[in-house]
């Protein structure tokens, strides 16, 4: 009975899902993730694709990696992908940004484990400021480019502070996550600033229910 209802629901929502799929391909930024789930009592991988306008699609797959990505929006997507560490996703999209919720979490860990550093506190506050500003922006075409450039300038200045601090304070052999985070943020500086300003902000991709 339940199985039949699920099948009927899937068939009836197919037009909506196809429409959402097409719309999501046009979004300048899309979040993607993969998490463990269960389908009909069996373990599977749930692939999630979500855009800032509220659209989200879930795909149950037997395998992770490229086999799991097949048939999802991510496979055909050509914009900026916001993701959590999974090197598979770096083969898709035109550019990549680590999920800001995770970045903020890692920065807090850096603040706790590297109390002598100042860059982590400064950039944590800046990212929060950027997110708050963008979420409060009511301009139809997004913030002015000069505002975005201003955020990027401050961002790069803080990263330069980080570089100098790590030159003065050698990386701890027992905690290298802060330094590695700095390197990732330096590599994706423009992407983080631009995507945060253009697309809005989704805190994180929630684990799907009902699998």
Predicted regions mapped to residue ranges:
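Catalytic center-proximal scaffold of phosphoryl-transfer enzymes
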Residues: 1-211
């Amino acid at each position: 009975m339940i199985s039949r209802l699920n099948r009927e629901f899937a068939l009836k929502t197919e037009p909506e899902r196809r429409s959402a799929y097409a719309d999501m391909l046009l979004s300048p930024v899309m979040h993607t993730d993969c998490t463990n789930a269960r389908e009909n009592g069996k373990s599977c991988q749930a692939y999630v694709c979500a855009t800032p306008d509220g659209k989200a699609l879930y795909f149950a797959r037997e395998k992770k990696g490229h086999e799991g990505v097949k048939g999802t929006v991510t496979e055909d997507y050509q914009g900026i992908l916001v993701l959590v560490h999974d090197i598979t996703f770096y083969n898709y999209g035109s550019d990549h940004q680590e999920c800001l919720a995770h970045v903020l979490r890692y920065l807090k860990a850096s603040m706790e484990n590297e109390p002598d550093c100042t860059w982590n506190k400064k950039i944590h506050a800046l990212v929060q400021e950027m997110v708050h500003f963008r979420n409060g922006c009511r301009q139809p075409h997004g913030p002015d480019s000069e505002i975005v450039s201003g955020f990027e300038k401050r961002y790069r200045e803080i990263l330069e502070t980080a570089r100098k601090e790590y030159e003065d304070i050698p990386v701890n052999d027992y905690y290298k996550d802060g330094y590695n985070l700095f390197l990732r943020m330096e590599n994706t500086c423009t992407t983080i600033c631009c995507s945060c300003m253009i697309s809005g902000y989704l805190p994180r991709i929630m684990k799907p229910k009902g699998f």
